[in-house]
Amino acid sequence: MNKWVIGIDLSTTITGVAILRNEQIIKTFAVAFDNFNEKNLYNNVIRLIKEINLNVWLLADDDYYIGIEVANFSNPKLTQRFSIYAGMIIALMSQVLRDFNAEFKMFNANAWQLKIPQIQYNTLRKDRKLITKNLMIKTFNIKSNLNEDEYDALAIAYFYDSINSTLEQEEITKAKKIVKMNKVKQQLSISKKINKLLEKKSKLKKATAISKVDEQIEELKKLNK
């Protein structure tokens, strides 16, 4: 089974996309959009889906995740458009990949930056782009000939991959605790039943009745192992 992660860096002009498989880069690219408006929105999204073309690579039992960066601008209308755009990507990919185990996540544009200490929330865009590029090159040994949109998309993909792995590990730990707690509860319940049977046995006189209780106790002891 493979684990695929896609990072999408939304932009009104050029959108960066990065695709990871088991934490290895499979593909990065950038798509230049004509105009970011209602008229061209749908066609731009269709182009993006065609470029990704995931259904060629994925196997039916592969895990698939996508992290989409949602704009965080002061202009509410522009933010709303980005949200609609991200929603369209999710809807279309759900159709294209309906046979796969797909999980989609959207997060705030600056959320992933805060997880990288070297990048400050209020860093100027130009500086932030350069810092992201250098981080990707140094931390993940990424080649240095990608454009800035591809580096941003890679940062999103790696960030979402790490979040997903952390969440998955937390769920595993939680599940283990529940199993352990259930085991303890089961053992206490069995111990109570055995004590009651021993109490009952002490009051019995007939050998056959005592033997029957002994059998019940032995069965409970087997469950307690």
Swiss-Prot record:
GO molecular function annotations of the record: nucleic acid binding
Protein's recorded name: Uncharacterized protein UU157
Organism per entry: Ureaplasma parvum serovar 3 (strain ATCC 700970)
Organism phylogeny: Bacteria, Bacillati, Mycoplasmatota, Mycoplasmoidales, Mycoplasmoidaceae
